[in-house]
Amino acid sequence: MLLNGIVAAVITMIITIIGIPRFIMFFHKKKLGGQPTLEDVKQHASKAGTPTMGGFVFVVVSLVVSLVAALVFGKFSPAFITAWWVFAMYAVIGFLDDFLKVFKQINEGLTAKQKMLAQILIGIVSYFIYSHGEKSHIIHILSWQVNIGIFFSIFIIIWLVGWSNAVNLTDGIDGLASITVAISLTAYAVIAVVHQQYDVLLIILSVIGGLLGFFVFNHKPAKIFMGDVGSLALGGFLAIVSILLHAEWTLLLIGAVYVIETLSVMLQVAYFKKTGGKRIFRMTPIHHHFELGGFSGKAAGWSEWKIDIVFWLFTAVLSVIALCIYFAF
């Protein structure tokens, strides 16, 4: 029931709010380095030394609370296990990456190849876990159902890898990723309620609760960042939730911000190579472009709060549009 999910969300939020300050104190006590700052964005100079890996707290709390709730309320289903597994395993990849950067002082963290290989392996295992409870190999596009057969395994891998990295790119300024993802997940919570998929709803609401608790300390000026442990987990979670709810196409609208952020990086890199050093944007992902003045030519750009609010509203509006189209068909 919806009430069970709300209870799980509130508990997750409260524990996260209690846990984050202790996590911050641990970072300061151990004198650990924070998330690297961007030299080209002067506004970020004050962020130097800010603790990172805050996603570890809300991910672990969300996982534990949702698992206990699923067992207590009888929602420990194959769909729940699939969502739980993806969220946990993508968090593990992010944790290893952050751990190498923060604790071992290896600036690169995991190499791109290591990270990609790990994501693909988790995608493969996720497919088999999903297939254990769901025999259908159908993807849903509006009112059409397309059976892609064996290629469904490839679709899951690409979907998980793509969205996990897209959300990772979006996590670049205070509060942006946490609330944007919370809004996206709220849209999927609506779909879960309407279709009475309360097993998936339970973990969705738990994660939303964790994000709201984290935002208390992540809004500008952020006292902590989520790190890859949070952003990779959230991206993978969004992707698998859209599949479990048979609403894959909706993520293209609900997650439009993540798509735009990713495309801005791809376009920038391609154009830079093609023109021998010229740029389309001042900096990518595109939220940094707006920080630096956008296309206006001005030296001063949008404040982080303005970028946050515009991106949040954009996500909220497109989420409503996606839901309207989804339920219309």
Curated annotation (Swiss-Prot):
Topological relation to the membrane, as annotated: Multi-pass membrane protein
Catalysed transformations (reactions): UDP-N-acetyl-alpha-D-muramoyl-L-alanyl-gamma-D-glutamyl-L-lysyl-D-alanyl-D-alanine + di-trans,octa-cis-undecaprenyl phosphate = Mur2Ac(oyl-L-Ala-gamma-D-Glu-L-Lys-D-Ala-D-Ala)-di-trans,octa-cis-undecaprenyl diphosphate + UMP
UniProt keyword terms in alphabetical order: Cell cycle, Cell division, Cell membrane, Cell shape, Cell wall biogenesis/degradation, Magnesium, Membrane, Metal-binding, Peptidoglycan synthesis, Transferase, Transmembrane, Transmembrane helix
GO MF assignments: metal ion binding; phospho-N-acetylmuramoyl-pentapeptide-transferase activity
Cleavable signal peptide: none
EC number annotated for this UniProt entry: 2.7.8.13
Highest taxon, organism lineage: Bacteria
Keyword check for Secreted: no
Cofactor or coenzyme needed: Mg(2+)
Chain ranges passing through the membrane: 1-21, 53-73, 76-96, 109-129, 141-161, 175-195, 198-218, 237-257, 309-329
GO BP term, example: cell wall organization
A single GO cellular-component term on record: plasma membrane
UniProt keyword Calcium, yes or no: no
Pathway: Cell wall biogenesis; peptidoglycan biosynthesis
Cell location: Cell membrane
Main function: Catalyzes the initial step of the lipid cycle reactions in the biosynthesis of the cell wall peptidoglycan: transfers peptidoglycan precursor phospho-MurNAc-pentapeptide from UDP-MurNAc-pentapeptide onto the lipid carrier undecaprenyl phosphate, yielding undecaprenyl-pyrophosphoryl-MurNAc-pentapeptide, known as lipid I.
NCBIfam families on file: mraY
Family named by the database record: Belongs to the glycosyltransferase 4 family. MraY subfamily.
Name the record gives this protein: Phospho-N-acetylmuramoyl-pentapeptide-transferase
Record organism: Lactococcus lactis subsp. cremoris (strain MG1363)
Classification lineage: Bacteria, Bacillati, Bacillota, Bacilli, Lactobacillales
